[in-house]
Amino acid sequence: VSKQTLKDQLAELPEGITKEVYIEVVMDRPGDVRDDGAWTTVTSNFTNLAQAATELNSTGNYNFKGIVIDNEDYNSEIFDCENYNAVSECDSYKDKMYQRGKDIMRGVLEAWPDVIMMQMHGPYTSDCDRPDYIAGVGVPCFDLKGSFFAGMVQAVSETPGAHPLLNGGQDYILYSPNDFQKHY
């Protein structure tokens, strides 16, 4: 998706929004994690989105603060080694997904240095040995989400002044501070 197309879509929002606005991105069927061409497009799309938001912010009429990645697998299960029939090669897929997260975050940070990035589900979903009160409610284990998140964290750590990557904590069974303390 071109920067101009994304900019035009974002510009359809009312000007003068005074509250902080976060742009939600749903990743759906970006391609096999080993497909460099497909993931170059994904990375370019994120970079173009960051550039479009930055340009609109510079007009003074918009207040985009960041990007929220809804990384829940609604259709494609891009974060699951079983989906790629690659359980025996899962470590190499984790390495590739780590690099994909890092590349995306680097592209976004180059275009929008003060962006606030959040993923709705953090790396906990890659821990198949998580507590029963998480696993017991049907939250599946996705081998590759943690690697994607870690790659993004690495890019942030290499960028002076970047905001930390946020774990959106979309965990409907965690309500109290004690619940989160036990989990994390």
Residue ranges and their predicted role:
Residues 1-184:
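Glycan-processing catalytic domains of CAZymes
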